[in-house]
Design a protein with these regions (language model features):
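Flavin-dependent oxidoreductase catalytic cores
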Residues: 1-490
Length: 490
C-alpha cells in the first residue's frame, strides 16, 4: 500500500513545517513569516556576471519563473494564443528572472511533442513577439528573459506517429520504454556536430530578438543530459572520462558564444540522477498507483550522471561538482539546478503530493525531495560562487515557498528561487509576496500533476484544477476520461 504523507496545506504555520522537516531528518531553513520588500532577501537585486564581449544583467529581485511547456504551439512551431497567454502570465509574475519561458527545439525532429515551439529563421520573429508581450505585462522593472534551447533525444515525438528516439547511448532500462533499438537511433559524432551548429544558429536568432540569455539544456533525460552519462559510447563524445562526456557541452557553449558574443549563456542541469523507477505492483490497490521502486539493474550502474555506481538510488557528487566548477571558464554565467527526469524519476525531479497518470505514488515524503533539490543548489553555489544559481522544487512548498526561499537566499544557498508549476496556477505569487499582499490560497499550486497528465494524454498543458480558464475548456473532460481509463487499466 502507498504511504500517505502529511500535506503541506494541512500544516498550521511555519513552526509546523519546521517540525515536519525535523521529523524527516533533513535540513531546510524556514522563516516564521514571508517578508515584503524591501525587508525580504527576495527583494534584493542580483547582478549576473558576463563573460568578455557581453554586458552583465541586473535582476530586480530573486524570484525566477521556471520553463513550463504548454505543448500548445502551432504546427509550424510558432506560438499560439495559449502560448501567448502563458507567457503573459510569466510577465505578470513580477519575477526578476524568466528562465527560458519554455523549451524550444533547435531541430524540428528534436521536439518532445508535435506542438512544441521551434526556433529557426521562420519562427524567430514570433518568439521575439512573445518576449515583448511578456515584458509588456511586467508590473515593475523588466525581468531578465532567456530562451531554453533543447533537443529531446530519446523522448523526441515530433509528430503524431509517436516516439522517434535519438540517443547518446543504449540505456539498459530506458531503451525498452522508448523503443530505442538498433544503432540507427544513436546520434553519430557528425550529427552531434551538426547539432552544435543548430544550437549556435538558435542562439544568434535569440540574440537578434532581444533575449538576454540562452539555456543550453542539460537536464531531465533529454539528449544533452544523456551525453553526460555516455560512458558506453564510442567516439569523441563518450567514454569513461568526464572530459570526453562533456566535450559536446563545451563545443556547443563555444559555438554559441562565437555566434552571439553579447548573449549570456546558462545551463539547466540535472545535477544528479537515479536509476529509473517504476510503480511497485504489490503496492497498487483500487486503481491507485503503487509507490515508486527502482527498476532492477546490473551493478555497477554506469548509465547515470551523478549516480553512485554501486548504490544507484544515491548521489555521487564528484562529477557534477567538477562540471559546475568548470562552467565559469567556459563563459557560462547562470546555472539552473534540477535533477532526474519527469519520465523515469518524477519524485526526484518535481516532488508532488499527487502523481501524474504515468507515474507512481511518492516513495518518500515529497518534502524530502524538496530538501534534496535545494541542497543540490547549495552545493552548486558553494562549488562556483561566481555563477548565478537558480533553485528548483519550491512549488511543492505552497504557502511556505517564500518562507523557505528567503531563508535560503539569506544564507547564501542560491541566488534565485525558481517557481514552475506555481507559475501556471498563480503566476502573480512573487509580486504578491514582495508587495506584502495576502496570498490567494485558492490559486496556490497543490501539485495535482494535471499539468503533466494532460500532455501525456495528448492534450495541452495547463492548471486544470485551479485556473478557471483551463477548468472551463473541453480538454478538462477529455483529461478526466483519460485519467479514469488509466485507473481502470491498473
Amino acid at each position: 500500500m502507498s504511504v500517505r504523507f502529511p500535506r503541506i496545506a494541512s500544516l498550521a504555520g511555519a513552526p509546523a513545517l519546521r517540525e515536519r522537516i525535523a521529523a524527516l531528518g533533513v535540513t531546510l531553513p524556514c522563516d516564521d513569516d514571508a517578508l515584503a520588500a524591501p525587508a525580504s532577501p527576495l527583494a534584493s537585486p542580483a547582478t549576473i556576471a558576463a563573460p568578455p564581449g557581453a554586458l552583465p544583467r541586473v535582476a530586480a529581485n530573486r524570484f525566477a519563473v521556471q520553463p513550463m511547456e504548454g505543448w500548445d504551439a502551432q504546427e509550424d512551431g510558432t506560438p499560439s494564443a495559449l502560448t501567448l497567454r502563458r507567457w503573459q502570465g510569466f510577465g505578470r509574475s513580477g519575477a526578476g528572472l524568466v528562465w527560458g519561458g519554455e523549451a524550444v527545439a533547435v531541430q524540428r525532429a528534436g521536439r518532445a511533442n508535435p506542438r512544441q515551439l521551434v526556433i529557426d529563421e521562420t519562427t524567430a520573429p514570433a518568439l521575439g513577439r512573445l518576449r515583448r508581450a511578456l515584458l509588456a505585462e511586467a508590473p515593475g522593472p523588466p525581468p531578465i528573459v532567456g530562451l531554453q534551447l533543447t533537443h529531446s533525444g530519446r523522448w523526441s515525438r515530433p509528430d503524431a506517429a509517436g516516439l522517434r528516439p535519438r540517443i547518446a547511448f543504449h540505456h539498459p532500462v530506458l531503451d525498452r520504454r522508448t523503443g530505442a533499438v538498433g544503432e540507427s537511433a544513436v546520434l553519430t559524432d557528425a550529427e552531434a556536430r551538426v547539432l552544435a551548429g543548430d544550437f549556435a544558429r538558435a542562439a544568434r536568432l535569440a540574440a537578434a530578438e532581444g533575449f538576454d540569455f540562452v539555456d543550453v539544456k542539460h537536464c531531465h533525460g533529454y539528449l544533452l543530459h544523456e551525453f553526460l552519462a555516455a560512458r558506453s559510447r564510442a567516439g569523441e563524445f563518450g567514454g569513461a572520462g568526464l572530459d570526453a562526456r562533456t566535450r559536446l557541452l563545451r563545443e556547443i557553449v563555444a559555438a554559441v558564444r562565437d555566434a552571439a558574443p553579447g548573449l549570456l549563456v546558462g545551463i539547466r542541469l540535472s545535477l544528479f540522477d537515479r536509476v529509473p523507477f517504476r510503480p511497485a505492483p504489490a503496492g497498487a490497490s483500487k486503481g491507485r498507483l503503487g509507490p515508486g521502486e527502482p527498476e532492477p539493474c546490473a551493478l555497477p550502474y554506469d548509465a547515470g550522471f551523478g549516480v553512485d555506481r554501486d548504490r544507484p538510488t544515491e548521489t555521487d557528487w564528484s562529477e557534477p561538482l567538477a562540471l559546475v566548477r568548470a562552467l565559469p571558464a567556459l563563459g557560462v554565467t547562470l546555472i539552473n539546478v534540477t535533477a532526474g527526469s519527469p519520465y523515469y524519476v518524477p519524485h526526484v525531479q518535481r516532488p508532488a503530493a499527487f502523481p501524474p497518470s504515468d507515474g507512481y505514488a511518492p516513495p518518500e515524503d515529497p518534502l524530502a525531495g524538496v530538501a534534496r533539490l535545494l541542497d543540490a543548489a547549495r552545493r552548486a553555489k558553494a562549488a562556483a560562487p561566481e555563477l548565478a544559481v537558480v533553485a528548483s522544487g519550491l512549488s511543492y512548498l505552497q504557502e511556505f515557498a517564500a518562507h523557505v526561499a528567503q531563508a535560503c537566499v539569506r544564507a547564501g544557498w542560491f541566488d534565485f528561487a525558481g517557481l514552475g508549476r506555481m507559475a501556471l496556477s498563480y503566476p502573480e505569487l512573487p509580486a504578491d509576496v514582495l508587495a506584502g499582499r495576502p496570498l490567494a490560497r485558492e490559486r496556490i499550486c497543490r501539485t495535482f500533476s494535471d499539468c503533466t497528465s494532460a500532455p501525456r494524454a495528448g492534450l495541452v498543458s495547463g492548471c486544470y484544477p485551479l485556473d478557471p480558464f483551463y477548468r472551463e475548456r473541453p480538454e478538462r473532460e477529455a483529461l478526466a476520461r483519460a485519467k479514469s481509463a488509466a485507473r481502470e487499466a491498473r
